[in-house]
Amino acid sequence: MEFTPPLQQGILLRRYKRFLADVQLSDGSEITLHCPNTGSMRNCLYPGETVWFSTSDNPKRKYAHTWELMTTPDAGLIGIHSGQANTLAEEAINKGIIKELTGYDSLSREVKYGDENSRIDILLQGAQKPACYIEVKSCTLLEDGQGYFPDAVSLRGQKHLRELMHMVSQGHRAVLLFVVQHSDIFSVAPAAHIDPEYAKLLKKAVLAGVEVLAYRCEMSPTEIHLAQACVVRV
């Protein structure tokens, strides 16, 4: 996915009220960005470092600028826009980058499924194949060289694991796909120290037949895309 128009940059001052962040531009002026990330963004905030943001020409938006990337102190990059994970996953599936998810005829987004009033991120269907239900999660939490998910207690994430297990019990294929938007994460594990129930459910889901995949993003201020598989430690 290319960033069009090109991203602009500034210096992070602060994130607050969950969905807002103030940055300083090169001329010394300050603007407020929309922060499209519902998580805690634990270990992803580096005041004084460079951020990259997009700008919308929609006059109805209260905040025209959206935070896209965060530069780390060691010159790495973090994808802040967690909502882009589904788009990145769809793009990678269509291009055949995710080898485990090739060979299907159709791809649908946000289809109702399960018995807990959920919508699946991606549904793949093909002739003479079980339907494949894919939940996509953005992973950005890095601690002691290990990537973790979630970065806060996630009741929604727990629900999605239950839904995936239900799909397997109905004879379908179910996949949990971690989209790694942190250049220094090379393996992903459940954050049992943050959400022990999620970690417990993930192990149960794997035993029930849910597949878990993780793919790293290649990121730059000009584009972002899924590039290669990485290790999942359940």
Curated annotation (Swiss-Prot):
Gene Ontology molecular function:
DNA binding
Q: Which NCBIfam families match?
A: sfsA
User: What name appears for this protein in its UniProt entry?
Assistant: Sugar fermentation stimulation protein homolog
**Xref: InterPro entries:** SfsA (IPR005224), SfsA_C (IPR040452), SfsA_N (IPR041465)
- Which parts of the chain are coiled coil? none
Q: Which family does it belong to?
A: Belongs to the SfsA family.
A Pfam family matched in the record:
SfsA_N
This chain's source organism reads Shewanella baltica (strain OS185)
